[in-house]
Amino acid sequence: MPKPQPSIPGLVIGGTGSNAGKTTFTLSLLCALHARGLMARAAKTGPDYIDAAFHAALTGQPAANLDTWMCREAAPSPAEHPLPAGRIPKGLGRVFERMSTVCSPYGDAEGVKAGTNPSARPDLLLVEGAMGLYDGGHRGAGSTAHLASLLGLPVLLVLNAGGMGQSIAALAEGFLHHRPAWAGGLPVRFLGMVCTHVGSARHADLLRQSLAPLTKSTGVPLLGLLPRQGAPELPSRHLGLVEAREALPAVDRQALTQWVEQHCDLNRMLKLAGVRTPQRAVNADTSGAPVPEAARQARLSEAHEPPSDRFFPLSDAQAQHPPRSQRRRRPVVGLAWDEAFSFCYADLPAVLHELGARIVTFSPLRDAAPPIECSGLYFPGGYPELHAPGLAANTGMRDALHGLAAQGMPMYGECGGYIYLMQSVQIAGQGHAMSGLLPRNCALGASKAALGYRAAQAAPDWPAPTCPTLKRSAAPPLWVRGHEFHYTQEEEIPLPTPCRPLWRLYDSQGRFLRDEGCRLGSVAGSWLHCYPEGSRRFWRAWLRTCAAYFSDTRP
């Protein structure tokens, strides 16, 4: 796949480690760019939903997750090498291409594909890294540095200067000159450096003096010294404590903007990144007319609506004339989306749309039933444990789901969605009824039950024959890649006909972990979060089951 078009500047925010201040700096930069009238598309490296949700909330644009390991649909292997610089996997290239589009965040149907209207292209593609710059999976796969190298983007290095003086130079020099094996001897390209957790003006002077020889010898400038005192506070983003849609009103955009403008040389940073002076006005709509503050806030609120086809709009011709193979039996996927279910990768609607599906949303918390036009239901991850009483109280939804399951409607749940498909969840010793579609109970624990990259091989008869022209036993293995992160222990409820697993689960180095998931009839659930571009064959097969259900149940 060719490299991304260089006409849109891009920048990767990489840090010396976790808690270096990458997220506060990234969100501050997004606010400052908006205040300057610049349109940014943001993304997060790795599988983390939380920070990506904050990016989307502040920009009004869907925020992608970019990952160099999860984007490949293949069996894992200890001998698997990270791809060399410049070789972009097809899946990763598709995600990056979508970032080159400015989507309408205002709930209308408009949206311009990148290249058709320069004013509708983002001014900057901003990617926030995870952990330390070179931290990743096996042999560095999935690291922020590896991603930056593949995409050809420069890195702005965030240095945690807390409790550090002259040693900051040694830390910075190590990061600037490190040569990972996958880089083929080529260094990561650095745009500049920013120091965070600066204690005082005297501390700032010491850091500046210590880094001066390095900036002179490398040509990598020091672009900011961000003080610890007075830094804007962000709501906790730990799993299970807060959602972006709940925390957004508490985010002081003006404070974030002022903090980064006062302590960073943004003009130089943007010039080095190749960002042009914006032609659109701040707080303006597409016609250039000023937008009243109340209307602007309403539009930002609409940006929290569920991810649907409008997030990745097609051209008018594509929308009105889908491929001939999709016209007769275009499946309609009901996406569970409310406070309890919000962990959906931003690219999943695009992948489902490209595979021929249409998406509608519903709320297991509030609705009496899924939309009547649905031919399949998907329950993403989220926080069902925080909304267990409300989910348990909605008996109408539970009854409707049991009726649809009896008719054979395909249903699939991931992590939090899997919990909802079970009989019950126990929280702090108290049980709460869930939908009761799968013979499983679970209990929320205080420590992580599972964490890490995962590759999974689908059972031969699930979700559907992957190659209808072949015998089922001769079909090629269906592999997906994704991530697992949960605090929950599950318990099987014995049945005369036991549940069957969905996946054979492996870690990133190809070590077998366990048979994973539970399926009973047309209902299936698993702890695995499938990465959309690492599971296209799976979703294509699952959509076939939805189309078959539609054909069997509709005249």
Model-predicted regions and their roles:
Residues 153, 220, 407-409:
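A short helix->loop->beta-strand "cap" motif at the edges of active sites that frequently abuts
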Residues 332-386, 390:
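Phosphate-binding active sites in nucleotide-utilizing proteins
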Residues 384-465:
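Cysteine-nucleophile active-site neighborhood
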